[in-house]
């Protein structure tokens, strides 16, 4: 750490009134581009309008102006998020059975949407229990609200109104910080101050205030709810905050106030800041006292982290110094120059953030079921399945986005003249070795993982079960995974003597938590079937990475097209007269990567859905006998491709296929419609541009004949536009089909 003289006083870092507010200008389509603003000559214009509206790089090359537009757009995004949240809370207040659910969460399903009786649609209002008819929701909001300490629909109303006010505030902020007081470029590039505010402010104080809310509001209210007190009898949140005696009745140490904190007698607080591990047997969720403790600890960590960097005082780390000191024996100049890249290329910065956030989202998916954080979440199987699936898809998209913006950085922002022998340059210089090795790994994984299944299908078809890879014949036990499970199951005794259970029941042991006769969670056994499908996961992930990484590393040049950087991020081919150079742009790699991301995530959510129904979810009798939804058939059925088709896809599709005439029939219609959307995509993906141009010209001829031809000349989609429309419908259709299949199934049987 270097101690320097204090920086001069804070500089004025905003420009006043830089851009005038003009509705006339905004009303003109394409005002951001000289070409598009001229108006349409052909139908390609509308596509270009959509493609470039948010591509701020194409509007101007001034980094300050681009930064301001992005900053302003972020406020717009936040405004939409607040609006959406407000809508969720409003539905909870106006159209839901939240108060009824709160009184009996094990027998009443959550619903916050009641369909109006138009053309018989009221059939969709199923009986969710407690005399309420509506659509069962699987978003997890009810469980979240209970954990927050919300006990009435009035409180939801107030929160909804609050969110609306914040939405308006964000909208105003977006306008204000672009048109009235726009930050200068230096402000966007002051990374130490940004770290200070984001770490200590957002994450540190954010976690601290949430921990405070949990201790003072959520914990006492949930304690009353768990004891069966009528929500209307429970004191209101502000009463707990203002009246310490109320809390002291539940947690005696509250009467001592902050004295134990300042006298370092912290164990006094162990009543409400616990370290138990495992799940609360009443609700099937993590102990809320553990969660409060966790947020307090996280707050302390981030408050410290936010004060490690040098801002206006001459003390602390400088990020540039840290990066430039980061050299290894084989990495040349190391991270020299990375600071400049990340403060002048927002694509590079965004790429890193998307990769991190995407990975984190997938980690969230895996923790939501293995450590269910909210009360009564674990026994709401529809919500569990939805949360897992949702976070897996989102994570997949974010990671593909990371590759997309890394490639855009390479094409638009990378300057090879100033980058020599740093880490990125060295990676680019041995990119052939990286990609060819990765390709070999993909071929190996593909043939071996798939080969194990094909072997099993063949042996099964020939009636030779004793020669199959299975837990009852040739075993391929996942020994490393089992070792990790076992280590974690035994951990509390050694690493955390105060904890009564391990972090998650899934690790192993004998504990089982059931709530209201339904299994919340139990140890998840791993066997040959998991070993096989795990290698399919490895295969699909590596292929996705191969495609995306090749797109990034060869974004500027390749042996085939040495001057690729001049052609831009997306282009159909390297001009006429150069055959075999189509579909090589960085954009095309993102396009292809999306399909493999879809493959990868599909296998993961199928694995999860079947494994949980087979080995975890189910009912428990008074004698303690567990009956799983599909009776533990995963271990023997999923070891053949035929088993996946017959016992998972076909057997579990019966609910969605037979949903007509029931309250689940909307899922049947979506299942059909989404298949159609998916099939529609193939028309764009399997067809050439010339075919459509010929067809269009015949149609234009007919219009001319009838004198109804439009002034704007119709054009076939370009190759890139066609592929964009194709992949969009492919993913939308595929995801919506899966959604309908999963939900109809799990709402019917769960």
UniProtKB/Swiss-Prot annotation:
Disulfide bonds: none annotated. Phylloquinone binds at residue 692. GO terms for molecular function: 4 iron, 4 sulfur cluster binding; chlorophyll binding; electron transfer activity; magnesium ion binding; oxidoreductase activity. It is an enzyme of class 1 (oxidoreductase). Its EC number is 1.97.1.12. Chlorophyll a' binds at residue 675. The keyword Iron applies. P700 is a chlorophyll a/chlorophyll a' dimer, A0 is one or more chlorophyll a, A1 is one or both phylloquinones and FX is a shared 4Fe-4S iron-sulfur center. It is a multi-pass membrane protein. One of its GO terms (biological process) is photosynthesis. Belongs to the PsaA/PsaB family. This is Photosystem I P700 chlorophyll a apoprotein A1. It comes from Citrus sinensis. The lineage of its organism: Eukaryota, Viridiplantae, Streptophyta, Embryophyta, Tracheophyta.
């Amino acid at each position: 750490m270097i101690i320097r003289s204090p920086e001069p006083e804070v500089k004025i870092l905003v420009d006043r009134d830089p851009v005038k507010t003009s509705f006339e200008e905004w009303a003109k389509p394409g005002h951001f581009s000289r070409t598009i603003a001229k108006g349409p000559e052909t139908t390609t214009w509308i596509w270009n309008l959509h493609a470039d509206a948010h591509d701020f790089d194409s509007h101007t090359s001034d980094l300050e102006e681009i930064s301001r537009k992005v900053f302003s757009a972020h406020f717009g995004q936040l405004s939409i998020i607040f609006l959406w949240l407000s809508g969720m809370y409003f539905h909870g207040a106006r159209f839901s059975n939240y108060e009824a659910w709160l009184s009996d969460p094990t027998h009443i399903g959550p619903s916050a949407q009641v369909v109006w009786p138009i053309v018989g649609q009221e059939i969709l209002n199923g009986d969710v229990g407690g005399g309420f008819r509506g659509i069962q929701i699987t978003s997890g909001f009810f469980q979240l609200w209970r954990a927050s300490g919300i006990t009435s629909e009035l409180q939801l109303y107030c929160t909804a109104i609050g969110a609306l006010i914040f939405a308006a505030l964000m909208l105003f902020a977006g306008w204000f910080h672009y048109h009235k007081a726009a930050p200068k470029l230096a402000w966007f590039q002051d990374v130490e101050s940004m770290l200070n505010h984001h770490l200590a402010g957002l994450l540190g104080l954010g976690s601290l205030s949430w921990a405070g809310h949990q201790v003072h509001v959520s914990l006492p209210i949930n304690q009353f709810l768990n004891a069966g007190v009528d929500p209307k009898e429970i004191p209101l949140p502000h009463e707990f905050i203002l009246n310490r005696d109320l809390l002291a009745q539940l947690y005696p140490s509250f009467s001592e106030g902050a004295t134990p904190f300042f006298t370092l007698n912290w164990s006094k607080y162990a009543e409400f800041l616990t370290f138990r591990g495992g799940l609360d047997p009443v609700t099937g969720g993590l102990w809320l006292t553990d969660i409060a403790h966790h947020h307090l600890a996280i707050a302390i960590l981030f408050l410290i982290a936010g004060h490690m960097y040098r801002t206006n005082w001459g003390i602390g780390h400088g990020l540039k110094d840290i990066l430039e000191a980061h050299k290894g024996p084989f990495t040349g100049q190391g991270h020299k120059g990375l600071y400049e890249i990340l403060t002048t290329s927002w694509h590079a910065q965004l790429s890193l953030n998307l990769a991190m956030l995407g990975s984190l989202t997938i980690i969230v998916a895996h923790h939501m079921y293995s450590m269910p954080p909210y009360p009564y979440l674990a026994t709401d199987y529809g919500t569990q399945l939805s949360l897992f699936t949702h976070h897996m898809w989102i994570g997949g998209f974010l990671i593909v986005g990371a590759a997309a913006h890394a490639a855009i950085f390479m094409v638009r922002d990378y300057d090879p003249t100033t980058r020599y022998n740093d880490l990125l340059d060295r990676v680019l210089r041995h990119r052939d070795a990286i990609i060819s090795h990765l390709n070999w790994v993909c071929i190996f994984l593909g043939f071996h993982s798939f080969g194990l299944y094909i072997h099993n299908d063949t042996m099964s078809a020939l009636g030779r079960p004793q020669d199959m890879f299975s837990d009852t014949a040739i075993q391929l036990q996942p020994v490393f995974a089992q070792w990790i499970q076992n280590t974690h199951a035994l951990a509390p005794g050694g690493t955390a003597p105060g904890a009564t259970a391990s972090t998650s029941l899934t690790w192993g042991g004998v504990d089982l938590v059931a709530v209201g006769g339904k299994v919340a969670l139990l140890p998840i056994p791993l066997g040959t079937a998991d070993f096989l499908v795990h290698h399919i996961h490895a295969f699909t992930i590596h292929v996705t990475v191969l495609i995306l990484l090749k797109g990034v590393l060869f974004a500027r040049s390749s042996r085939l097209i040495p001057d690729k950087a001049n052609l831009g991020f997306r282009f159909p081919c390297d001009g006429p007269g150069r055959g075999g150079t189509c579909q090589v742009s960085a954009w095309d790699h993102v396009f292809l990567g999306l399909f493999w991301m879809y493959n990868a995530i599909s296998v993961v959510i199928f694995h999860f859905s079947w494994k949980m129904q087979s080995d975890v979810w189910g009912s428990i009798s008074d004698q303690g006998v567990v009956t799983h939804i599909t009776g533990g058939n995963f271990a023997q059925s999923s070891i053949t491709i035929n088993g996946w088709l017959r016992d998972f896809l076909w057997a579990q599709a019966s609910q969605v296929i037979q949903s007509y005439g029931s309250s689940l029939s909307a899922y049947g219609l979506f299942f059909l419609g989404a298949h159609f959307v998916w099939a529609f995509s193939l028309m764009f993906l399997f067809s050439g541009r010339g075919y459509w141009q010929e067809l269009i010209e015949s149609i234009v001829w007919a219009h001319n004949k009838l004198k109804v031809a439009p002034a704007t000349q119709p054009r076939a989609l370009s190759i890139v536009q066609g592929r964009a429309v194709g992949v969009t419908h492919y993913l939308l259709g595929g995801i919506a089909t899966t959604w309908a299949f999963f939900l109809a199934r799990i709402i019917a049987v769960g």
